[in-house]
Amino acid sequence: MKKVFSVEEIKEIESREFRKRGGDSFSLMVNAGVNCAKKIIKLVKKKPIIIVCGPGNNGGDGFIIGNYLHEKEYKVEVFCLQKKYYKGDALKAFKKLKIKTQNISKFKARKNSVIIDCIFGTGLNKPISGTLKSVILRMNKLNKIISIDIPSGINGDTGKILGCAVKAHTTLALHAKKIGHTLNPGKKFSRKIIVVDIGISKKFNYK
């Protein structure tokens, strides 16, 4: 069974799982968010949490994580884009969010908080610039950052930095490691990698 996958292979594995679920992709996002939140609880105990959400499904995972931690009585702040930038499952997760959000441009680093990086996942294919680059540079001033799936700004296939990248303390890889986790600088930026089971059948890992 393979243990490290390309971005395209992960997309195919997810597509097979969606078909098995009758096209229900949102339930997989919920699994990913909830299971990541459970890992976060084990890693950080009761520290304040700041979740930074980008425009895609990685941001959607962040909204699910935020709700779960909020229900467990964690102090949670969510910084994200405006609603118009979300679609599909990410928009669905945004609408279900029970926490008041703040605009991502207003993000401020706080030394006593743990940052959850949900800005970009493995689907990023162009350099980060503008506001999101500024946010990442501010995030990197902190020691404790947990990235969801891959540090934002790291190419999932090459490990290269796309404009800038989050320097994670821990990376929660969804379902399996990606090639970008194993190649520098992606390997260095991912630091400690924990694979999180998100409910995808392991039989799809076989070619």
Labelled PLM ranges:
Residues K38-I119, P127-I148:
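Nucleotide and nucleotide-moiety/phosphate-recognizing core
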Residues M1-K46, S201-K207:
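Positively charged, low-complexity intrinsically disordered leader regions
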Residues K2-F5, N112-K207:
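YjeF_N-associated NAD(P)HX repair module
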Residues I10, C36, V76-V78, I116, ...:
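Hydrophobic aliphatic residue packing
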Residues S15, R19, V52, C80, ...:
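A near-ubiquitous, low-amplitude feature marking generic local secondary-structure context
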Residues N31-V34, N57, I136-L137, K192-I193:
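Short, surface-exposed, charged/polar-biased interaction segments
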Residues F5-E8, G23-N35, G60, G88, ...:
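Conserved active-site and cofactor/substrate-binding residues in soluble primary-metabolism enzymes
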